[in-house]
Amino acid sequence: MLFRSIPDFDARPELLDTVAAAKPDIIGHNIETVERLTPQVRSRARYATSLRTLELLARRGAATKSGLMLGLGESDDEVLQTLHDLRRAGVRIVTLGQYLRPTLEHYPVAEYITPEKFEAYRQQALAMGFDYCASAPMVRSSYRAQEALAAIKNEKSETRH
């Protein structure tokens, strides 16, 4: 299995064509957080550019994946809006995990999300049409990538995690 996690490349089609031409099984670009928090959490990234990057890759036939860190101060409505935005961009795989502050210089944790809330988000993501959603406190970007690949290939896959 070939999984590539990429930067947004400023949504430049010629660069995204190069990535897509390599035909990885899954191309990942993480949106990381909700639109409102993007300027504070991702100082060099733009929410719209990330969505455009994912959309351009999906249009090229790539199986796209994105991830969100939760616990930064986002509301339920903002999480659901972000999931809707990702689906509209053609994203098929999504991961949701708890943000953990790596150092005191990084953005602070606003909330620790319960496993029950992660499960509710997973159910909502699947209802929106994502082929695979991993959603739990310790989920990270490439979490169970093999299961995600099986899900997008319509193979039997356990998507509970």
Which role does the model predict for each range below?
Residues 1-2:
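Short, small-residue-biased leader/transition segments that mark boundaries at the very start
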Residues 5-7, 67:
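Structural motif
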Residues 6, 15, 26-28, 37:
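Structural/interface elements that position substrates and couple domains in central-metabolism enzymes
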Residues 7, 31-34, 98-99, 138:
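Short, ordered loop/turn segments at secondary-structure junctions
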Residues 12, 36-37, 41-52:
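Active-site-adjacent beta->alpha loops and helix N-cap segments on the catalytic face
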Residues 12-21:
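Distinct, well-ordered alpha-helical segments
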Residues 21-23, 48-65, 70-161:
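Auxiliary Fe-S-binding modules of radical SAM enzymes
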Residues 33-42, 62-69:
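Short, flexible active-site loops
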